[in-house]
UniProtKB/Swiss-Prot annotation:
It holds the Pfam family Peptidase_A8. It comes from Shewanella baltica (strain OS155 / ATCC BAA-1091). The lineage of its organism: Bacteria, Pseudomonadati, Pseudomonadota, Gammaproteobacteria, Alteromonadales. This is Lipoprotein signal peptidase. GO terms for biological process: proteolysis. GO terms for molecular function: aspartic-type endopeptidase activity. Its EC number is 3.4.23.36. Pathway: Protein modification; lipoprotein biosynthesis (signal peptide cleavage).
Amino acid sequence: MPLTWKDSGLRWYWVAVLVFFADQLSKQWVLANFDLHESLNLLPFFNFTYVRNYGAAFSFLSDAGGWQRWLFTIVAVGFSTLLTVWLRRQSASLLKLNLAYTLVIGGALGNLVDRLMHGFVVDFIDFFWAKSHYPAFNIADSAICIGAVLIIWDAFLSGKSETDSAEGVKK
């Protein structure tokens, strides 16, 4: 285990802070400038549209009656804590994993603040084609998804290198 924060993945925590503030500032801008369901068309396939998400990704459990707010709060705190512990235990040189963990932490904490302050998450990024809309999302959601992809990518690369080295031993 690295001895100082400079030697550990915690050195990358600034990414989580940056994601958190970008997410919160963008949501505050939406709350100050949009009415619920109001849209601003930016491109023929892209709007800013203020919606409230009472659930998780893709509005999962959004109509569950309110208990999901506390479930998702516990999940966000739990994952953020776990990833912070893992950051502390790994080397600062593990670029992909440190970036992935801090993206997820920043996104989870950004959405956590919304849940605690408002009881819902502010979503506003709206991609569409004709009349078909992708579920609205926010900067925190984007960071969580990018972080998850990086974690999966790293797992596949780690598995491949272990397989390659195991095959090398067999020869």
